[in-house]
Amino acid sequence: MSALCWGRGAAGLKRALRPCGRPGLPGKEGTAGGVCGPRRSSSASPQEQDQDRRKDWGHVELLEVLQARVRQLQAESVSEVVVNRVDVARLPECGSGDGSLQPPRKVQMGAKDATPVPCGRWAKILEKDKRTQQMRMQRLKAKLQMPFQSGEFKALTRRLQVEPRLLSKQMAGCLEDCTRQAPESPWEEQLARLLQEAPGKLSLDVEQAPSGQHSQAQLSGQQQRLLAFFKCCLLTDQLPLAHHLLVVHHGQRQKRKLLTLDMYNAVMLGWARQGAFKELVYVLFMVKDAGLTPDLLSYAAALQCMGRQDQDAGTIERCLEQMSQEGLKLQALFTAVLLSEEDRATVLKAVHKVKPTFSLPPQLPPPVNTSKLLRDVYAKDGRVSYPKLHLPLKTLQCLFEKQLHMELASRVCVVSVEKPTLPSKEVKHARKTLKTLRDQWEKALCRALRETKNRLEREVYEGRFSLYPFLCLLDEREVVRMLLQVLQALPAQGESFTTLARELSARTFSRHVVQRQRVSGQVQALQNHYRKYLCLLASDAEVPEPCLPRQYWEELGAPEALREQPWPLPVQMELGKLLAEMLVQATQMPCSLDKPHRSSRLVPVLYHVYSFRNVQQIGILKPHPAYVQLLEKAAEPTLTFEAVDVPMLCPPLPWTSPHSGAFLLSPTKLMRTVEGATQHQELLETCPPTALHGALDALTQLGNCAWRVNGRVLDLVLQLFQAKGCPQLGVPAPPSEAPQPPEAHLPHSAAPARKAELRRELAHCQKVAREMHSLRAEALYRLSLAQHLRDRVFWLPHNMDFRGRTYPCPPHFNHLGSDVARALLEFAQGRPLGPHGLDWLKIHLVNLTGLKKREPLRKRLAFAEEVMDDILDSADQPLTGRKWWMGAEEPWQTLACCMEVANAVRASDPAAYVSHLPVHQDGSCNGLQHYAALGRDSVGAASVNLEPSDVPQDVYSGVAAQVEVFRRQDAQRGMRVAQVLEGFITRKVVKQTVMTVVYGVTRYGGRLQIEKRLRELSDFPQEFVWEASHYLVRQVFKSLQEMFSGTRAIQHWLTESARLISHMGSVVEWVTPLGVPVIQPYRLDSKVKQIGGGIQSITYTHNGDISRKPNTRKQKNGFPPNFIHSLDSSHMMLTALHCYRKGLTFVSVHDCYWTHAADVSVMNQVCREQFVRLHSEPILQDLSRFLVKRFCSEPQKILEASQLKETLQAVPKPGAFDLEQVKRSTYFFS
């Protein structure tokens, strides 16, 4: 094979096909020779060789199609190769003058020893080459400018392979005999024989591939990419390509090891849906040849194909008999295998030929959660008052259609709230220029996308994995519009190349899922069922029996959402990288935008630079400054958002499973996970359905809360936003207000200290400018969405993180945001204040000011009466009056409450006033409340208001007082730092550290927190900050140890347990009291993957790789706070479900619960009752038993597990605190 001196360009190809020692004649136009031109021998001058080499590299793309022929000649291991005729330049044969040469069927090994023949015709050839060079180059340029058609490629390359190459001689003989016989019966006989023959290992090097039952995380990156490729080919009608790649990989020993049963099954299922019996049998031959055992999905594919082809009953009967012999039950085909309704019907048709009386397993009644904690939630007896929405059925149906249309479009255009101005001549010109450029970019991107797809298709034909089917999922114009949308939203300072790649692949996947539901008929089925579902929620409709939304959706027999598995992380990163590079290479603009028609030179719109972040070199794509300036001049009036980033216009779908709920069509994860991690989703999938009912119903309830925008507050915020902001009130200023960098140009003789000072000043200005731009953009998105949703009703679908904590899905505008974001939101459905609602409004107002935290409720109410004039003045003249509201801790929420109080007190009947304002009730350091309850710690319970008291207990003030006692003692002993701290130990100094100790903050982190607080004190001697922060953090931890002894004991037990579990090579797992499985995803980042090539190599950590060792430090430090978070989420969910049963509106921000003013007393009662019920369970004992069973039962680790088992069983003993006291604690949540 050494005779094939292969190169990347035309020269290499022609040398490969030319006999040694004889020159070639000029080829005809349109042939390989015509494109490449005659080549000089190696005796040509270096300058001429350099020119040839440059031409070669320029022609690579067109000539790559001919490389397949040479690779084919080299691939002796592939026996059946069918090649279309490949036209090449006519070359003289050795010793012959006819000037023709047919490409050799097989290159002779002795060719390398051929003796060169002296050439006497070189002078004439060189002279002719000079005369025709210019003409040929002109023709070449014209040809290169023509789009490369896929039809041309298919005419030049080999056909797709269908028949497999089998390693087993016996099976290969059977296949050969089968292909020689009549085309009807042999395939049925072969199918029966294949299914009856037990698979066996063919040789030592043919290893059993991973079973289809194994998790995706256990597959290598190459296997994940291949499996995703096969599945994607099925979705894009590229089944022949998938079969071809499967045959190529199966025919090569090394590549065969990558194939798994799932891959064979995917291709089999595709052929089954087409009724292609012969091709299906080919795949089964390969399955048996690989030594694999067909599973339920394999049999389902075979039966489906026979059902479509109307096969005889004998073959079907033998297939069912073989299933039975292998222990596979017929009923499992319809219960354990995920098939579409059409596929199930076809399989059933085949089965009925043999067993006409067979019927599908009866649909069992929906299972009911029997958890003790949820027994009352699902009880049929007792009084139930599930709330209804305030909107009629017809209105809700119209809202549903709007939301459906929005998700089908995948994007939403929103008018920007930047200060509107009449477009000047300059602005109009900039917008016209921008439109012209975008039209050009759209054409260039379409052309680049087609060329890329053709190139990637060639790679598949050559038997290599490529992203070709993934690029075929969406219409070309849809992909281009998505790329241009990303380009428009790119910030001026640029975006990380990896982040951009990830975003592009995520958007592609989301659009694909929506489009697939559109073409599969899923949308029509959803419309029919959703209209019925709305009868449960509409104000003017009734249902036979009140029930929870999930239960009603299941009773309707609603269609199961398509289970579209997310693409593996390697595929996501490769696809995103490809699209990002395409965007960079295809978008160009004139170097002078002022005179674009006169400027012939084009420059890239995006350029690639490197920056250092945390000592890591990060690739960044930055827009050209001229393009940024053009965008600023154009001042386009709209912003474009993804549909999933905008609140919903109709009630979300109820969560019914880990993959079905929230948005109508757009894919949404039930559990947010680290990028690439799959363990959480697999845990949820294997979890019994009833175990998740509590979490699913709580998330549905939170998402069903209807919202509206507070228009008066929005007007005021917009007024400040458009008037250069007000950072003191949380309204960011525009970047133009950022401090200007120094303009001084220092001479070379300037002192190094002066240069360093200037560099620091410049870096500070740049940092501030970036932060201001980020804050301004965030506020712009939030306020633009609020303006867009003004006078509308909308909903916020929820999901949860791996600990069970809940979050709204739309990221830009929700109630988990800042003070401004919360003030802009209010309940769409109001409720009369009733006899006590106005009092709760006033108490809520005082709570927001932060002025009376340690006072009882009656004094807070009295304070509200004292400042009523300021309250009314703030409501009436917020920006021109006394501005009392601006001094509050939460100024904008305080202002919104002032307006609500003013409306209520001025109403003729305040009790009848319909209030929409959410009233908050906060836990008293909720993490410590859970710790005190777990340990039955009397001292700790009293500090965090678990124990009834006439006044609220403030744990932060208590810790500060205890630290002051220690400081006074040390000061008396003459300790200098203790003397300096006299008068500086306040609640504010220690609050953050006390609050975060419960969530695992270390002494180092606590010291930094205290240092920050001390630096904020202008009169504290700054030279003592470091020493004082060290001293205070020790005293804070010492105070907590004395005040919360039970808490520290539980923390230590959890930390030590996690440390030992990690040392055994496992990550920590547990199950929340509501049944949600939790697994900590912290593993060592040892396996960093790299995708090379292109403008930049990108690296990423494969978080889904469960073979990596646990990160012991993160596991042990994360277990205590994560466990407590799982408890506070369980408490919140129980409270939400019981409030829903009582007809209350309820939402939460973790440990801050919101409801109407009229219902605060009821919510507080439910909150206290559910906390007592939760902690009446033996939570730590249950955790201990679970961990012992999970990590101490493996026989091979019995010796290692002895210490772990001993630690796990040493549960800290509880104290004597009586939990029932919580029910009488007024300030438990207040």
UniProtKB/Swiss-Prot annotation:
Region (Disordered): 18-55, 95-115, 731-750
Example GO molecular function: mitochondrial promoter sequence-specific DNA binding
Outcome of mutating residue 641 to L: In COXPD55; results in mild reduction of transcription of mitochondrial DNA in vitro; reduced DNA primase activity and
Effect of residue 870 to N: In COXPD55; uncertain significance; results in decreased transcription of mitochondrial DNA in vitro
Substitution effect: residue 611 to F: In COXPD55; results in decreased transcription of mitochondrial DNA in vitro; reduced DNA primase activity
UniProt-annotated location(s): Mitochondrion
Enzyme class: transferase
UniProt keyword terms in alphabetical order: Disease variant, DNA-directed RNA polymerase, Mitochondrion, Nucleotidyltransferase, Primary mitochondrial disease, Transcription, Transferase, Transit peptide
Disease named in the record: Combined oxidative phosphorylation deficiency 55: A mitochondrial disease characterized by global developmental delay, hypotonia, short stature, and impaired intellectual development with speech disabilities in childhood. Indolent progressive external ophthalmoplegia may be present in some patients. COXPD55 transmission pattern is consistent with autosomal dominant inheritance in some families, and with autosomal recessive inheritance in others.
Protein name per Swiss-Prot or TrEMBL: DNA-directed RNA polymerase, mitochondrial
Organism field: Homo sapiens
Gene giving rise to this polypeptide: POLRMT
